[in-house]
Amino acid sequence: MSDNRRSRMITEGPQRSPNRAMLRAVGFGDNDFTKPIVGVANGHSTLTPCNAGLGALAARAEEAIRAAGGMPQIFGTITVSDGISMGTEGMKYSLVSREVIADSIETVVNAQRMDGILAVGGCDKNMPGALIAMARLDIPAIFVYGGTIKPGHYKGRDLTIVSAFEAVGEYSAGRIDEHELLEIERHACPGAGSCGGMYTANTMSSAIEALGLSLPGSSTMAAEDEEKALSAARSGEVLVEAIRANRTARQMLTRKSLENAIAVVMALGGSTNAVLHLLAIAHAADVPLTIDDFETIRQRVPVLCDLKPSGRYVATDLHRVGGVPQVMKILLNAGLLHGDCMTITGQTIAETLADVPDEPPANQDVIRPFSQPIYPQGHLAILRGNLAEEGCVAKITGIKQRRITGPARVFDAEEECLEAILSGKIKAGDVVVIRYEGPKGGPGMREMLAPTSAIIGAGLGDSVGLITDGRFSGGTYGLVVGHVAPEAAVGGTIALVEEGDSITIDADARLLQLNVSDEELARRRAAWQPRPPRYTRGVLAKYARLVSSASLGAVTDRFSE
């Protein structure tokens, strides 16, 4: 069979002469119409350093695709900056953008009958958005990550964007002055690349590498290093090879490979958002996966990497000592990865890792040996209780206090909570509740990095709990619980919490409990009324109508289940 399995529908035969005429206008010649047409979904944008370098990577991939015998066609897809929109109404559009990215890539690739897709992305939702599209399309596909930002430096310590968020809390608490705040701001982001710790972007790029849909070692490269450009070019070559072999995305996106990705996220100490995104990718690929599968894998996979936000190092440090392949080799040797999973290169995971050392390098402590983990079990725990009958997600490593019972401090929006923290109204022992911020209620399930960073900056990170039906940034740490489901907007128990109620968060018992009698809860539930939608027109209104529970990945196309 020819390599242009799909695009021949628009390039072959006399009736397609008008189609060919238009393609000639964008560079096709007589000998190009039998070549595979390869889409390059380019997320380049100067909105954010995460995506500022993507144009050059897309160009390198385009050149390589052409040299390998394909016909590349570049098209744009969107991004929003989570870091810039954080703490504002604009953050409601962040998770929405995952769906827009997925829908836009699916739309273009299917409309133009492309034979393969290479997606280039950087900011948080670029990665899952692209993977959801690849899973729906099930054609040869590869992802090129824009790369991580290098750490900033100030007064002998490494800085990331989270340093700037935490500095706001420190300034409000009087722990640093305005000059110190400004200097941290000036040094936190020294150039192009995605946020440098094991936050959401680096977590998801690592997960994609574990899934086999990006090149080995590519997920921790620095955005501004030449090896990243070389990796983009090689990705184009590999994709053309995959088109010739008809190696499609769902051959990589299997139950086993998703279990591999979850294991790698746990070993890295990755973002809570990985739960949401991997559930959504599994849904798009028609692979059964539930929130409880994360808990099962967590209990057997240790945290091996000492990475920010709760650790000391950033992604470039991880790359220097072997990157994700080194972590995967350790897990493979421990029987915690499925080595028979296929990758886009045509090799299995085990074959890909064959030449990777069995142990991490000596004289470093970024990656620990399996026998000396940072934590014996994974860090993303699934909690349940009467406050989260469908489950919720807690990052339980890097915290000193693993259980808290305290009075609820209830806020119906992120802004109200942040104001209370910055004005000193939150005290040690409190359990902060931020609700009506879920997928439907926000809508858009905003990340609560500003409130959690303010709590850390105020010196309350070890003594205040926070629960929300919203999300957390990958940069969040502390005694925090997100993705509470059912959410407040649909009448979940979190909507029934009243100021001063006793709430227990117990990381070890995996419990989130409102300490109120069943009779009182029944009375409150009978009196509860749904709130009118915050938006009645536009994309947020559409999203609120379509989106599923966070426990199902907050997808927008779950219609028949």
Curated annotation (Swiss-Prot):
Biological process, per Gene Ontology: branched-chain amino acid biosynthetic process; isoleucine biosynthetic process; L-valine biosynthetic process
Domain of life: Bacteria
Record-listed E.C. numbers: 4.2.1.9
Name of the featured protein: Dihydroxy-acid dehydratase
InterPro entries for this protein: DHAD_IlvD/Edd, Dihydro-acid_dehy_C, DihydroxyA_deHydtase, DiOHA_6PGluconate_deHydtase_CS, ILV_EDD_C, ILV_EDD_N, IlvD/EDD_N
Organism phylogeny: Bacteria, Bacillati, Chloroflexota, Chloroflexia, Chloroflexales
Pathway: Amino-acid biosynthesis; L-isoleucine biosynthesis; L-isoleucine from 2-oxobutanoate: step 3/4; Amino-acid biosynthesis; L-valine biosynthesis; L-valine from pyruvate: step 3/4
PROSITE patterns documented for this protein: ILVD_EDD_1, ILVD_EDD_2
Co-factor binding comment: Binds 1 [2Fe-2S] cluster per subunit. This cluster acts as a Lewis acid cofactor.
Positions bound to Mg(2+): D82, D124, K125, E447
PANTHER family to which the protein is assigned, alphabetical: DIHYDROXY-ACID DEHYDRATASE DAD, DIHYDROXY-ACID DEHYDRATASE, MITOCHONDRIAL
Top-level EC class: lyase
Complex and partners: Homodimer.
Cofactor: [2Fe-2S] cluster; Mg(2+)
Purpose: Functions in the biosynthesis of branched-chain amino acids. Catalyzes the dehydration of (2R,3R)-2,3-dihydroxy-3-methylpentanoate (2,3-dihydroxy-3-methylvalerate) into 2-oxo-3-methylpentanoate (2-oxo-3-methylvalerate) and of (2R)-2,3-dihydroxy-3-methylbutanoate (2,3-dihydroxyisovalerate) into 2-oxo-3-methylbutanoate (2-oxoisovalerate), the penultimate precursor to L-isoleucine and L-valine, respectively.
Catalytic activity: (2R)-2,3-dihydroxy-3-methylbutanoate = 3-methyl-2-oxobutanoate + H2O; (2R,3R)-2,3-dihydroxy-3-methylpentanoate = (S)-3-methyl-2-oxopentanoate + H2O
Residue list for modification N6-carboxylysine: K125
Active site location: S473 (proton acceptor)
One MF term in the entry's GO annotations: dihydroxy-acid dehydratase activity
Entry binding sites for [2Fe-2S] cluster: C50, C123, C195
HAMAP family listed in its UniProt record: IlvD
